[in-house]
Amino acid sequence: GEAHTNDYALYHARAIYEGQRAEQKKDGSNKRVFNLTRSAWTGQQQYGTVMWSGDTSASWKTFRNQISAGLNFCASGLPYWTADIGAFFVKDGDSWYWDGKYDDTTNDPAYLELYTRWYQWCCFLPIFRGHGTDCRRELWKFDGEGGMFYQALLRMNALRYKLLPYIYSTAGKVW
């Protein structure tokens, strides 16, 4: 028979999609399926999947890698991809993968700069989410309401809201 090694993501996405659709038939609703996953396979966009890059560590190198990863991923024909704004792991941890560079988190001006740049970039991704461990992600946690970083984040937040009609209508075309 045919060898299949990495297509579990496709079958997993299909199972979630079909399960949600079956439940919707019972209650008469017709909502779009939304499945946030970090695994991908060709064709799974038909099952309402959104891929994200996984739990990354906060560093400028990781941020640079996220940009190229997002561009390459979307070139594959899967329209929905996102990243954890500012990385998932901010501090340095015990495990090899927990390799953040900012133990003082939002008290470190260097992390505030990195987070702000990441936020500015993610504003233009299909899915916009600040998610992670080690520190809170609310805008006011980033140097207070009068601060330079807070103001930059606020401006990008306003821009994101202005882009929502475009993002939503474009999403409807590819869904």
Q: Which residues are covered by each model-predicted region?
A:
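Catalytic-domain carbohydrate-binding cleft regions of carbohydrate-active enzymes
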Residues: G1-W175
